[in-house]
């Protein structure tokens, strides 16, 4: 899965965080840029399409707009939060935003490897640690802690893969933006 620019291809997935006492089921709606592994995350108590749209609308698209970069396509699995008729909220949102919706082959999660890898990282480095340290009574403080971790992941934590070569995701994106200007 190659992309020549930030925002050209994003991968999205919904990850079951757990059943939290007093809250119920909690899901992470994750989006990862295939260009430099920049990641976004929104916690919600459902897998509904509206929650999957919320992370795009509130976090992802404003980020790329600030950089002056278009979002070309989003790759998802075939989950109900992402797929349906043209009036499906996620499908409709992407169409109205002029973003291509690509889908993985059924039952082939490795096709969406960028976001699957991120899910493993966020599970190991954030959720397993925080859930042992903190009792969360609502989603909001957990989201605040996730937001702080995402700042670390995107701006402080070096990524050793061939795309970033030890750079942080924001460095990879900023490097592209500088070269294009």
Feature locations, PLM:
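Acidic/histidine-rich, metal-coordinating catalytic segments
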Residues: 65-85, 105, 163-166
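Short, conserved catalytic/metal-binding motifs centered on acidic residues
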Residues: 13, 37, 74-77, 94, ...
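RNase H-like two-metal-ion nuclease catalytic core shared by retroviral integrases
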Residues: 76-78, 87-94, 101-125, 138-141, ...
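A short acidic/small-residue loop/turn micro-motif
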Residues: 35, 45-49, 79
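Short small-residue beta-strand/loop micro-motif enriched in glycine and branched aliphatics
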Residues: 38-42, 102-104, 128
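Active-site beta-loop-alpha junctions of metal-dependent nucleic acid enzymes
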Residues: 42-67
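Mobile-element integrase/transposase regions
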Residues: 1-32, 38, 54
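C-terminal domain-tail junction helix/linker
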Residues: 1-2, 6-7, 97-99, 121-181
């Amino acid at each position: 899965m190659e992309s020549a620019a930030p925002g050209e291809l994003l991968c999205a997935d919904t990850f079951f965080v757990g059943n939290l006492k007093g809250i119920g089921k909690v899901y992470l709606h994750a989006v990862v840029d295939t260009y430099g592994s920049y990641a976004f995350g929104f916690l919600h108590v459902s897998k509904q399409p509206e929650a999957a749209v919320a992370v795009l609308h509130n976090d992802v698209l404003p980020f790329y707009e600030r950089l002056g970069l278009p979002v070309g396509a989003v790759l998802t699995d075939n989950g109900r939060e992402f797929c349906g008729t043209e009036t499906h909220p996620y499908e409709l949102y992407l169409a109205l935003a002029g973003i291509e919706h690509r889908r993985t082959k059924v039952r082939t999660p490795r096709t969406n490897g960028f976001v699957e890898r991120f899910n493993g990282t966020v599970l190991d480095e954030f959720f397993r640690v925080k859930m042992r340290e903190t009792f969360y009574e609502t989603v909001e403080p957990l989201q605040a802690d996730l937001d702080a971790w995402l700042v670390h992941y995107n701006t402080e934590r070096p990524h050793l893969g061939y795309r970033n070569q030890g750079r942080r995701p924001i460095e990879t994106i900023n490097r592209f933006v500088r070269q294009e200007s």
